[in-house]
């Protein structure tokens, strides 16, 4: 496996419910490296670009309204297989279909308030990281326990 990066965002419901530390902890415990982190209330323009693939869907305006309704914690995580692994940690989009032990399975109830977003593939990850972060906001660093994480 090769090192890759993925974009993850704690949505306004997760921030308002005080779930930031728990969600960060799940990714750190898994062994991934946090290379980008910021809290912001997304602009309508940013939200429309982020959800652009859904622009013709009936729920598009609701997605934009929700993601711009309050602060979001935007993150970039790095690690071997981090994109697929993050998707497994996050769980199914519909919380009622998410397995127990996943973030959505444990912390979310409704699809409209499903706590977290994660990139669904490598192309999406690159697009979302570049949309939400400037290159100088991402930090390359070597954790002191790196030798204990990977071979």
UniProtKB/Swiss-Prot annotation:
It is found in: Cytoplasm. The keyword Chloroplast does not apply. One of its GO terms (cellular component) is cytoplasm. Transmembrane segments: none annotated. One of its GO terms (biological process) is UTP biosynthetic process. Pfam families: NDK (PF00334). One of its GO terms (molecular function) is metal ion binding. Disulfide bonds: none annotated. Its cofactor is Mg(2+). ATP binds at residues 11, 59, 87, 93, 104, 114. Its EC number is 2.7.4.6. Keywords: ATP-binding, Cytoplasm, Kinase, Magnesium, Metal-binding, Nucleotide metabolism, Nucleotide-binding, Phosphoprotein, Transferase. The active site is at residue 117. It comes from the Bacteria. It is an enzyme of class 2 (transferase). Its main location: cytoplasm. SUPFAM superfamilies: Nucleoside diphosphate kinase, NDK. It catalyses: a 2'-deoxyribonucleoside 5'-diphosphate + ATP = a 2'-deoxyribonucleoside 5'-triphosphate + ADP; a ribonucleoside 5'-diphosphate + ATP = a ribonucleoside 5'-triphosphate + ADP. InterPro entries: NDK-like_dom (IPR034907), NDK-like_dom_sf (IPR036850), Nucleoside_diP_kinase (IPR001564). Belongs to the NDK family. Major role in the synthesis of nucleoside triphosphates other than ATP. The ATP gamma phosphate is transferred to the NDP beta phosphate via a ping-pong mechanism, using a phosphorylated active-site intermediate. Homotetramer. This is Nucleoside diphosphate kinase. It comes from Prochlorococcus marinus (strain NATL1A).
